[in-house]
């Protein structure tokens, strides 16, 4: 039996397993119940009890060797059949282009905004996107019946009519409240971040967008300081030729309040469909911080005054890159985004 085992091992070594037919022939010869290895197992009962354990171990090793040889050959044939094993390479072909990533247009604009305001002496403050009702509305002088506090305009997480109601912040103004509660004047900060509004998605509006707000609190701060800050920002952001106008407006947290427009990027102020024939596009809202807001943050309005402003980063990106649909900024279409890489 010893010679027979050795002979079968040599047959296994010499077997050419280079096709599916030969692989099947190997299986039929060595691995089936009527194969040569199985026949040797049947002959074990003819051996003496002394020799039977030794040859049983040898046969088990032979069987495992045959099975492993079969499995390895089967894997190689599967790889070749799928084409993964082919090594045909034309080394004369040019290499594939390596695409490099770039900053998203919104992040580019936000980065430029930060640099402009940092050069003016502003620091950066951030806060939670899941905010308390009291920080988002009450401390900002919003009356209890203000439309913004309705479920149709704000994403409420919990709404029990209490100060501890949770919501997705509708602006980054709560960050200003947190700063005024934690720090003493003078305060000069910008607050960038995501905000959420329960709005219908369209070419001009989205349910989530990026906002940057600014706050300056000190003694004898005036509206002239606010205008100088906005003018300086706009000239650096949109170019020295841009024209601005301030329009009276209303916000609960500022008094007086204004909205700021710049000349339309598409028509240069002549009037077109983007600016609705007005020649102007709104870029931000601003005003002097309301005395009630200062009092809510334990700041004496008789001693200190300040201004605040807020702008949509996404809308500014639309203006800068002449994009006419805000939804394009959120679709992550690389073909569109790579046009604005720098």
Swiss-Prot record:
Signal sequence region: none
Keywords: Aminoacyl-tRNA synthetase, ATP-binding, Cytoplasm, Ligase, Magnesium, Metal-binding, Nucleotide-binding, Protein biosynthesis
InterPro entries named among the record's database cross-references: aa-tRNA-synth_II, aa-tRNA-synth_II/BPL/LPL, Phe-tRNA-synth_IIc_asu, Phe-tRNA_ligase_II_N, Phe_tRNA_ligase_alpha1_bac, Phenylalanyl-tRNA_Synthase, tRNA-bd_arm
GO molecular function, one term: phenylalanine-tRNA ligase activity
GO biological process, one term: phenylalanyl-tRNA aminoacylation
Residues bound to Mg(2+): 255
EC number, as in UniProt: 6.1.1.20
Major localisation: cytoplasm
EC primary class: ligase
Free-text comment on the cofactor: Binds 2 magnesium ions per tetramer.
Cellular component terms (Gene Ontology): cytoplasm
Cofactor needs: Mg(2+)
Compartments reported by the entry: Cytoplasm
Reactions catalysed according to its record: tRNA(Phe) + L-phenylalanine + ATP = L-phenylalanyl-tRNA(Phe) + AMP + diphosphate + H(+)
Subunit comment: Tetramer of two alpha and two beta subunits.
Family, per entry: Belongs to the class-II aminoacyl-tRNA synthetase family. Phe-tRNA synthetase alpha subunit type 1 subfamily.
Protein name (Swiss-Prot/TrEMBL): Phenylalanine--tRNA ligase alpha subunit
Species in which this protein is naturally found: Chlorobium phaeobacteroides (strain BS1)
């Amino acid at each position: 039996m010893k010679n027979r085992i050795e002979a079968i091992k040599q047959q296994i070594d010499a077997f050419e397993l280079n096709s599916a037919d030969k692989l099947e022939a190997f299986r039929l010869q060595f691995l089936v119940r009527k194969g040569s290895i199985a026949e040797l197992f049947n002959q074990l009962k003819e051996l003496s009890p002394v020799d039977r354990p030794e040859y049983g171990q040898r046969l088990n090793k032979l069987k495992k060797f045959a099975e492993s040889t079969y499995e390895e050959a089967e894997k190689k044939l599967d790889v070749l059949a799928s084409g993964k094993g082919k090594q045909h390479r034309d080394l004369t072909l040019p290499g594939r282009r390596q695409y490099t990533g770039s900053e998203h247009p919104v992040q580019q604009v936000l980065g430029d905004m930060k640099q402009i305001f940092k050069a003016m002496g502003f620091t950066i403050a951030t806060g939670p996107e899941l905010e308390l009702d009291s920080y988002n509305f009450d401390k900002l002088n919003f009356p209890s019946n203000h439309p913004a506090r309705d479920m149709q305009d704000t994403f409420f997480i919990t709404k029990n009519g209490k100060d501890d109601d949770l919501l997705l912040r509708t602006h980054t103004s709560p960050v200003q409240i947190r700063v005024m509660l934690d720090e003493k004047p003078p305060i000069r900060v910008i607050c960038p971040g995501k905000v959420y509004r329960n709005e219908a998605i369209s070419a001009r509006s989205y349910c989530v967008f990026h906002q940057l707000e600014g706050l300056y609190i000190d003694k004898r701060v005036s509206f002239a300081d606010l205008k100088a800050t906005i003018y300086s920002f706009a000239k650096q952001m949109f170019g020295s030729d841009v024209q601005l106008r301030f329009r009276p407006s209303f916000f609960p947290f500022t008094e007086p309040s204004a909205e700021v427009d710049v000349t339309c990027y598409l028509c240069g102020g002549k009037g077109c469909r983007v600016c609705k024939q007005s020649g102007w596009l709104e870029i931000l809202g601003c005003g002097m911080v309301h005395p009630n807001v200062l009092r809510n943050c334990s700041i004496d309005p008789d001693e200190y005054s300040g201004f605040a402003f807020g702008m949509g980063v996404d809308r500014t990106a639309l203006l800068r890159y002449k994009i006419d649909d805000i939804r394009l900024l959120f679709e992550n279409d690389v073909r569109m985004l790579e046009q604005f890489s720098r």
